[in-house]
């Protein structure tokens, strides 16, 4: 079973065609070093350019900003808001 929060990151990585190594973490047996990446021990954690980002929505925004092409959302504000609503429902 995949965590819905980690699924957000996976969906964005797939939609944007980002080359990534996906690592599954056993949420019942998290390795100690995982807490160095996220003090809360939650997924996802995105490692990129020597840094790391956690919290699923912040990670999603980071991936959109770090990999702008292709854009994940439309340019028009109302269309973009509706896309985010759909995305939010799809990843709950």
UniProtKB/Swiss-Prot annotation:
InterPro entries: Glutathione_S-Trfase_N (IPR004045), GST_Omega/HSP26 (IPR050983), Thioredoxin-like_sf (IPR036249). One of its GO terms (cellular component) is cytoplasm. Glutathione binds at residues 30, 43, 55-56. The active site is at 3 (nucleophile). It comes from the Eukaryota. Its EC number is 2.5.1.18, 1.8.5.1, 1.20.4.2. It catalyses: RX + glutathione = an S-substituted glutathione + a halide anion + H(+); L-dehydroascorbate + 2 glutathione = glutathione disulfide + L-ascorbate; methylarsonate + 2 glutathione + H(+) = methylarsonous acid + glutathione disulfide + H2O. GO terms for molecular function: glutathione dehydrogenase (ascorbate) activity; glutathione transferase activity; methylarsonate reductase activity. Keywords: Oxidoreductase, Transferase. Induction: By treatment with KCl and serotonin. SUPFAM superfamilies: Thioredoxin-like (SSF52833). Coiled coil: none annotated. Residues 1-71 form the GST N-terminal domain. Belongs to the GST superfamily. Omega family. Exhibits glutathione-dependent thiol transferase activity. Has dehydroascorbate reductase activity and may contribute to the recycling of ascorbic acid. Participates in the biotransformation of inorganic arsenic and reduces monomethylarsonic acid (MMA). This is Probable glutathione transferase.
């Amino acid at each position: 079973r995949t965590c819905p929060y980690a699924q957000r990151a996976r969906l964005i990585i797939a939609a944007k065609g980002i080359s990534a190594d996906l690592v599954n973490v056993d949420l019942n047996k998290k390795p100690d070093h995982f807490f160095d990446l996220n003090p809360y021990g939650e997924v996802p954690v995105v490692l990129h350019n020597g840094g790391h980002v956690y919290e699923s929505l912040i990670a999603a925004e980071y991936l959109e900003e770090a990999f702008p092409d292709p854009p994940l959302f439309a340019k028009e504000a109302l269309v973009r808001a509706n896309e985010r609503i759909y995305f939010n429902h799809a990843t709950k």
